[in-house]
Curated annotation (Swiss-Prot):
Coiled coil: none
Organism ancestry: Eukaryota, Viridiplantae, Streptophyta, Embryophyta, Tracheophyta
Protein name listed in UniProt: Beta-glucosidase 3
GO molecular function: beta-D-fucosidase activity; beta-galactosidase activity; beta-glucosidase activity
Cysteine pairs bridged by disulfides in the record: 208-217
Residues bearing attached sugar chains per UniProt: 221, 415, 436
Top-rank taxon: Eukaryota
Membership in a protein family: Belongs to the glycosyl hydrolase 1 family.
Keyword field: Disulfide bond, Glycoprotein, Glycosidase, Hydrolase, Signal
UniProt organism field: Oryza sativa subsp. japonica (Rice)
The reaction(s) this protein catalyses: Hydrolysis of terminal, non-reducing beta-D-glucosyl residues with release of beta-D-glucose
GO biological process, one term: carbohydrate metabolic process
Metal-binding found in the keyword field: no
Amino acid sequence: MAAAAAFFCALLFISVQHGVLGGYTRNDFPADFVFGAATSAYQYEGAAAEDGRGASIWDTFTHAGKMKDKSTGDVASDGYHKYKGDVKLMTETGLEAYRFSISWSRLIPSGRGAVNQQGLKYYNNIIDELTKRGIQVHVMLYHLDLPQALEDEYAGWLSPRIVEDFTAYADVCFREFGDRVSHWTILAEPNVAALGGYDTGEFAPGRCSDPFGVTKCTVGNSSVEPYVAAHNMILTHAAVVRLYREKYQTLQKGIVGINVLSLWSYPLTDSTADLQAAQRYKDFTYGWILHPLVFGDYPQVMKKAIGSRLPSFSKVQTELVKGTLDFIGVNHYFSLYVSDLPLAKGVRDFIADRSVSCRGLLQGVRFIAQTMQAPTRSMGDPHGLQLMLQHLKESYGDLPIYVQENGKYRKASSNDSLDDTDRVDYIKGYIEGVLNATRNGVNARGYFAWFFVDMFELLSGYQTRYGLYRVDFDDAALPRRAKRSARWYRDFLKSKRQPLQIAQQ
């Protein structure tokens, strides 16, 4: 969910000069490293009202006209009907792995109770098709698309009741698909879901309170709800991991982890205050989620700044959540510079609690720190990804790490070009960043391009394109055509030598 990254700060994109030295091939990566691409259910599947699928909070959000282009994911890329052709394209591209998410409301329309047999058949068909073609299956149980029935019943992630219902849903997935799926990500970007859905109001379910919401929300509390939602997501993750480890892992031999948006933050200056601000940004962004799952509690800097608004873990909960990661999944798109801000007095939200200011280097490009607005330009910083991966190792130990989303978008236009050389350069540079991290001892296990095909974007609808394959959304047949980036990825995966990009500050 690349556009979502923008909300975490004024979205700085680092401009990096590159020189060429040597080269790399697919074979320069460890033998157990996989290259793939990814999609998510609401953004890809479409078929919103077909075969018994229940509504999700994103259906409600988009149908209320909340998207800037007034679009919905009702059709999206029509992956529900076109998955076989897309898997064929994956094979032709040489993908070694594919990461997709399951729509909870397609599998269990009301969020609990009876399984929708048509939904079960659909996901079995996808998994079988991938397995038949030798593509490793990576499944994400939740990509921000909560069943609307549970939102209506008890406000979804704001209630501890979500833990039981989600765990029951996960049990169905492990039971039905676990014989062919060995890589499970429980939640996608809980840091994004909590902030965008419950502070700024720019993501479903669109809750916020004045003066913090970017749009006018009718319900919400931006000072409290982001922390409550994230807390329940952490407890849910832990409960699902315990279920998997106790009931399935010995037999299925799979691994379970979580996914977080993980941008790199540089201090704007070398002052002590800015150095602390850069670390505070990391603690508030991904330490918010990872620190409890590794150590059993929130970062101390968050506890101090937020106080009683931050939920606490009981002793039993601490033992439940601690050590519940077999791997870390990260979504990374760019880096940013941050500087210190004094902690504001009075009512604060997450952004004010974090107390940092973000700066960009590109003149004439405005970003607003309080929003998640999609950036208009993206200049990559592969070295930032390398530093972020190394920081995760230093902070959380030698856990395997998968880069589960990385990509660059272009604005949609009537004459979308297939010649996306800028995306090729971007991906090439970021793969180099991962390679350098592995050479420095990081236990990186995979890289997934985001998206495989153009899809509905959660912030910008159909106004931006991330895919390796172009989807013509003006054609009812939604034909796919390979972009230059798809051809480059195919050649790379066939081990053709690629120029190595060396960052020069």
